[in-house]
C-alpha cells in the first residue's frame, strides 16, 4: 500500500532528523523582514540570512516542509494552474539544509538513501536520472563512482540560458551574492509516456520529471561577475511534496494524489459538479490551499501587493465555480475539508478556521457585485464604440479591475457583432507581468548589506546603562575602522542595554559616550546576531575597540514599556469581548501610542470598545505581576502562549505572563506590574483591510493627557453654549433643532427665489425650428437649485431645450433639460457633453436631463454661445 501525502511528508522529516538535522517548522507565507520577496516561494527563504552570513542559528543542519506560494511576480504559475499536471499556486517544498556543515558527498548520499532504500521511499534505482552542472566534475564523480549511476543516466548541463552561469544547473540568489552549481534528480515514468531526458529536444514531455534539486552554494558572485569561493560552502535542497507523492503513489499527475482526490471530491460536492475530470475542479482544489493559508498568515484581499494577488486567486476560483454551475457562495465551505486533508500541517489553519471562512465568504459576495459593475462598464464602453472592435486596454481593465475574464467580455461583444482586440489584451497583460517581474525576486545587491560576524549580548531587560566595547563600525553599509564628528554610522557593541526593533516594539534611543566623544543613538536595529546603534557622532572620534558607556533614554523606554504591556492586556481583552477568532495581524509600540491590528470582520460597536477599555483597566487595577520564563517553543505553545504575527522564534523562547489574564511569546520590554500602566484609553478604531481592524490607544501620562484634553473641549463647548457640562447634551440638541428650523426656512426662501428666477428666464427663450431654446448663465444660484429650475422651465415652455450654468468658487456647474417630445432629435447627455468639454469638464445623464461640471470658468460664455448652432443643426 502506497504512503499518503501526510505520511510522505513525515517520512522525509524523520529521515533527516535521523541524520542529525533540526526539524524546523514552516515559516509564514509572508516573508519575514524581506521586502524583496512577494511570497515565500522556496524552503530556503527563511534561512536566507543564514546563507548570507547575516544570521546565525544554534544548528548547522536543518530540514523543513515549507508552505510556498507562486502566483504573481517572477514565479507566476496562475494561468497554468489546473490545466497542467504539475502547476500549483500553493505547494509544499521538502528540504534539507547544511550551513557550512556537510557538502556534496553527504548531500548526494542522503538523497540517494532516502529515495532508494527499502526502509524509506524504495524507488527503483534504474528509473532515476541525474543532471549536474557542466564543469562540476566533483558531483559527477560522486554520482558515478560512489553512488553507481551509469554514465548514460548522468547528464551535464551547460550555460543554456544565453550567459555565463545562466543554466538550469547553476543557482544564483541575485545579481550578486551566494551561488553555485546544482544537481537535479529526475524520475522516469516509463516509455508509455511521451518525453525525453533532460537536455534533449523532448525534455518538455512528461516522461522524465524532476523530483529533487540539490544546490551547492560554494561561490560568492561579485559585482564584476567574478566568483570567489565561500569560506563555508553550504547546501540547499528542494523537493516538491506533491511531485514525490505522485511518483510514490504511481500516478502521473499531481492532481491524482490522495490529497487532491479528496479536495476535488469536496469541490464537486459544494458546487454540484458531477464530472470529476472537469479542469475547473482542479483549479478550485488548488486555489483553496493558497487562499486559506495566505489569509491564515495575515494576507487580506485588497487592490495592491500581496492582497491583490490573493484577490485574483479567489476570483479565479469563484469564476470556475460559476462555470461548474454553483448557485451560491461555495468557496469558503472548502476550508474544513482542506484542514482535514492537510493533517498536522493544517494546525495553524484550524486555529483560524472561522476567520478564514468569513474572509473568503465576504470576498466571494463582493465579487458578485463587482461582476455586475463590470457588465455595466462594458455596456458603457460598447455604447461609445464607433467601430466594430473593443480595444485591448478596455478588455484588460475589465479583467484587471473587475476580475472580468476576457472570454466573457468576448461573449457579450459577440452578441452585438463586436470583436475584442485580444492581441491588445495580451500586450497589456504582458506589460503587467513585466512590472510584476521587476517588482519581485532577489534583485538586491547582497554584498552591500551589513554583515556582522560577531554577536551582541542584549542586557536591556535589567540595565539601562552599561559599559561595552565597539566591535564593528559601518558607514553607508561598509565596515570602517573609525568615524569622526558629524558622521552618521552604525555602531555595534559586544554588549548593550539598547533594545533593537522587534515584535512591533521600536528600537531604543539614547547615547553612547566616552571621555572624548558622544554618539547620539536615533534607532537600534538587529543585524543577524548583532545589535546596531544607528545615529551620528556629535563630538570627538570613535574607533573599533573603544570602550563606551551606553545610556538608554530612560523616560522614553519607560513609556514604551507601559504601551507594550498594555498591548498584551488589550489582545487578551479583545479575545474575551469579541471572541477567540481575534488574532494579532500586526502591531506598533512606541513611546507615544500603541497600534494593534487584529482579525475581526466588522467595526467594533461603541459598547464593545468600552468593554475592552474597562477590562484592560480592571487588570491594571488588579496590579498583576508581569513575569517572564524561558522555555522550549513547543512547551510554550502547550501552555497556551500566543505568538506574535510575522515574528521568528528560536527553539528557546521568552514567555511573558500577566497573572492569569495573558500569556504570550514576547522578547520585548515590559512594566513590572500591570498597575504601573496607570490608565488605558482607546483613541481610535478603524479598518485597514477586509477582515482586519486597527485600534490605537494610549497609556499612563498619555492617557491622562487625553482625559484633560477631552475635559477642556467640553468646557469650551459649554462656555460657547452658555451652559455647563451637566446640561451640555440638552443645550446641543436645542441648538441643532433651531439650526434645522432655520435651514428649512432658508431652503423655502431659495426655492421661492428660484421659482421667481425661472419665471423671469422663460421670457428669454428663443424659437429654433418650433422648439423653445433657453441658454443662460445665472449668478447667485446654488448648483443644486439648477435641477429644480429646469423642471419648472420645462413645465412653462412645453417643447423646449434648456441649458443653465452657474459658477461658484471658480467651478462651473452645468445642467441640460430636454422635453421628452424632442429627445429623439436632441439628447441632453450629448448636449451637456459638448458644452462641458469646452470648459474642461465632463458629464452625462438621461436623454431628458443631464449634468456636468468644469474647471475653466473663463471659457463658459463661448461654450454657452455655441449651443444655439449645435441645437439648430440637430433640429433641421
UniProtKB/Swiss-Prot annotation:
GO annotation, cellular component aspect: cytosol
Catalytic activity: tRNA(Ala) + L-alanine + ATP = L-alanyl-tRNA(Ala) + AMP + diphosphate
Cofactor entry: Zn(2+)
Keywords: Acetylation, Aminoacyl-tRNA synthetase, ATP-binding, Cytoplasm, Ligase, Metal-binding, Nucleotide-binding, Protein biosynthesis, RNA-binding, tRNA-binding, Zinc
Pfam families: DHHA1 (PF02272), tRNA-synt_2c (PF01411), tRNA_SAD (PF07973)
Cysteine pairings via disulfide bonds: none
EC assignment: 6.1.1.7
Main location: cytoplasm
Sites of N6-acetyllysine modification: 74
Matching PROSITE patterns: AA_TRNA_LIGASE_II_ALA
Subunit text: Homotetramer.
Domain free text: Consists of three domains; the N-terminal catalytic domain, the editing domain and the C-terminal C-Ala domain. The editing domain removes incorrectly charged amino acids, while the C-Ala domain, along with tRNA(Ala), serves as a bridge to cooperatively bring together the editing and aminoacylation centers thus stimulating deacylation of misacylated tRNAs.
Family indicated by similarity: Belongs to the class-II aminoacyl-tRNA synthetase family.
Name the UniProt record assigns to this protein: Alanine--tRNA ligase
Organism: Escherichia coli O6:K15:H31 (strain 536 / UPEC)
Gene name in the database record: alaS
Amino acid at each position: 500500500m502506497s504512503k499518503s501525502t501526510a505520511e510522505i511528508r513525515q517520512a522525509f522529516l524523520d529521515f533527516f532528523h535521523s541524520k542529525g538535522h533540526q526539524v524546523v517548522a514552516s515559516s509564514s507565507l509572508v516573508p519575514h523582514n524581506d521586502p524583496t520577496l512577494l511570497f515565500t516561494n522556496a524552503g530556503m527563504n527563511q534561512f536566507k540570512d543564514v546563507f548570507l552570513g547575516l544570521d546565525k542559528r544554534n544548528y548547522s543542519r536543518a530540514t523543513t516542509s515549507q508552505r510556498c506560494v507562486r502566483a504573481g511576480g517572477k514565479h507566476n504559475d496562475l494561468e497554468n494552474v489546473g490545466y497542467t499536471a504539475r502547476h500549483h499556486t500553493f505547494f509544499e517544498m521538502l528540504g534539507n539544509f547544511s550551513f557550512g556543515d556537510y557538502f556534496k558527498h553527504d548531500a548526494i548520499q542522503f538523497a540517494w538513501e532516502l529515495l532508494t532504500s527499502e526502509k524509506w521511499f524504495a524507488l527503483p534505482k534504474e528509473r532515476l536520472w541525474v543532471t549536474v552542472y557542466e564543469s562540476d566534475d566533483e558531483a559527477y564523480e560522486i554520482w558515478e563512482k560512489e553512488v553507481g549511476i551509469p554514465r548514460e543516466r548522468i547528464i551535464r548541463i551547460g550555460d543554456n540560458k544565453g550567459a555565463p552561469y545562466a543554466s538550469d544547473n547553476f543557482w544564483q540568489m541575485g545579481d550578486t551574492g551566494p551561488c553555485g552549481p546544482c544537481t537535479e534528480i529526475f524520475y522516469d515514468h516509463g516509455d508509455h509516456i511521451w518525453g525525453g531526458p533532460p537536455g534533449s529536444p523532448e525534455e518538455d514531455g512528461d516522461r522524465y520529471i524532476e523530483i529533487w534539486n540539490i544546490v551547492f552554494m560554494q561561490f560568492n558572485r561579485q559585482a564584476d561577475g567574478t566568483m570567489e569561493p565561500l569560506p563555508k560552502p553550504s547546501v540547499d535542497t528542494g523537493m516538491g511534496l506533491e511531485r514525490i507523492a505522485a511518483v510514490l503513489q504511481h500516478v502521473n499527475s499531481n492532481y491524482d494524489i490522495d490529497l487532491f482526490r479528496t479536495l476535488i471530491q469536496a469541490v464537486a460536492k459544494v458546487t454540484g459538479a458531477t464530472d470529476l475530470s472537469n479542469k475547473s475542479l482542479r483549479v478550485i482544489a488548488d486555489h483553496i490551499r493558497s487562499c486559506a493559508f495566505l489569509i491564515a498568515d495575515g494576507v487580506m484581499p485588497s487592490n495592491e501587493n500581496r492582497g491583490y494577488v490573493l484577490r485574483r486567486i479567489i476570483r479565479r476560483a469563484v469564476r470556475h465555480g460559476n462555470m461548474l454551475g454553483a448557485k451560491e457562495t461555495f468557496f469558503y465551505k472548502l476550508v474544513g475539508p482542506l484542514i482535514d486533508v492537510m493533517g498536522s500541517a493544517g494546525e495553524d489553519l484550524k486555529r483560524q478556521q472561522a476567520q478564514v471562512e468569513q474572509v473568503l465568504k465576504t470576498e466571494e459576495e463582493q465579487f458578485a457585485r463587482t461582476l455586475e459593475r463590470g457588465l455595466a462598464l462594458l455596456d458603457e464602453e460598447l455604447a461609445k464604440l464607433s467601430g466594430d472592435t473593443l480595444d485591448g486596454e478596455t478588455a484588460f481593465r475589465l479583467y484587471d479591475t473587475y476580475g472580468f475574464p476576457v472570454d466573457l467580455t468576448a461573449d457579450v461583444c459577440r452578441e452585438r457583432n463586436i470583436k475584442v482586440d485580444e492581441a491588445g489584451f495580451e500586450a497589456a497583460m504582458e506589460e503587467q507581468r513585466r512590472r510584476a517581474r521587476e517588482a519581485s525576486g532577489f534583485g538586491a545587491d547582497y554584498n552591500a548589506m551589513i554583515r556582522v560576524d560577531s554577536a551582541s549580548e542584549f542586557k536591556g531587560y535589567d540595565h539601562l546603562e552599561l559599559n561595552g566595547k565597539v566591535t564593528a563600525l559601518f558607514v553607508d553599509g561598509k565596515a570602517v575602522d573609525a568615524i569622526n564628528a558629524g558622521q552618521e554610522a552604525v555602531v555595534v557593541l559586544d554588549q548593550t542595554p539598547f533594545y533593537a526593533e522587534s515584535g512591533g516594539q521600536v528600537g531604543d534611543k539614547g547615547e553612547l559616550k566616552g571621555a572624548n566623544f558622544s554618539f547620539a543613538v536615533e534607532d537600534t536595529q538587529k543585524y543577524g546576531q548583532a545589535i546596531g546603534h544607528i545615529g551620528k557622532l556629535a563630538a570627538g572620534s570613535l574607533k573599533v575597540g573603544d570602550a563606551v558607556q551606553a545610556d538608554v533614554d530612560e523616560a522614553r523606554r519607560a513609556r514604551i514599556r507601559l504601551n507594550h504591556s498594555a498591548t498584551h492586556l488589550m489582545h487578551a481583552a479583545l479575545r474575551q469581548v469579541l471572541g477567540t477568532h481575534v488574532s494579532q495581524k500586526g502591531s506598533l509600540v512606541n513611546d507615544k501610542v500603541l497600534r494593534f491590528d487584529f482579525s475581526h470582520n466588522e467595526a467594533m460597536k461603541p459598547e464593545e470598545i468600552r468593554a475592552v477599555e474597562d477590562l484592560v483597566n480592571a487588570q491594571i487595577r488588579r496590579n498583576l505581576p508581569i513575569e517572564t520564563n524561558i522555555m522550549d517553543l513547543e512547551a510554550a505553545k502547550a501552555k497556551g502562549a500566543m505568538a506574535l504575527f510575522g515574528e521568528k522564534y528560536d527553539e528557546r523562547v521568552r514567555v511573558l505572563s500577566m497573572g492569569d489574564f495573558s500569556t504570550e511569546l514576547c522578547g520585548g520590554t515590559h512594566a513590572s506590574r500591570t498597575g504601573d500602566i496607570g490608565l488605558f484609553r482607546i483613541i481610535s478604531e478603524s479598518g485597514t483591510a477586509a477582515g482586519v481592524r486597527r485600534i490605537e490607544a494610549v497609556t499612563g501620562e498619555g492617557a491622562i493627557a487625553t482625559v484633560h484634553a477631552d475635559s477642556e473641549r467640553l468646557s469650551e463647548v459649554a462656555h460657547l453654549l452658555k451652559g455647563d457640562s451637566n446640561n451640555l447634551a440638552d443645550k446641543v440638541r436645542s441648538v441643532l433643532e433651531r439650526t434645522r428650523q432655520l435651514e428649512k426656512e432658508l431652503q423655502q426662501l431659495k426655492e421661492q427665489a428660484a421659482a421667481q428666477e425661472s419665471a423671469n428666464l422663460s421670457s428669454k427663450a428663443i424659437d429654433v425650428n418650433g422648439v423653445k431654446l433657453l441658454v443662460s448663465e445665472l449668478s447667485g444660484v446654488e448648483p443644486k437649485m439648477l435641477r429644480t429650475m429646469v423642471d419648472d422651465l420645462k413645465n412653462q415652455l412645453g417643447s423646449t431645450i434648456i441649458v443653465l450654468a452657474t459658477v461658484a468658487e471658480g467651478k462651473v456647474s452645468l445642467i441640460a433639460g430636454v422635453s421628452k417630445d424632442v429627445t429623439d432629435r436632441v439628447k441632453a447627455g450629448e448636449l451637456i457633453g459638448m458644452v462641458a468639454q469646452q470648459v474642461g469638464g465632463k458629464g452625462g445623464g438621461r436623454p431628458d436631463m443631464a449634468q456636468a461640471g468644469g474647471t475653466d470658468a473663463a471659457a463658459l460664455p463661448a461654450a454657452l454661445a455655441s449651443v444655439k448652432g449645435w441645437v439648430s443643426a440637430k433640429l433641421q
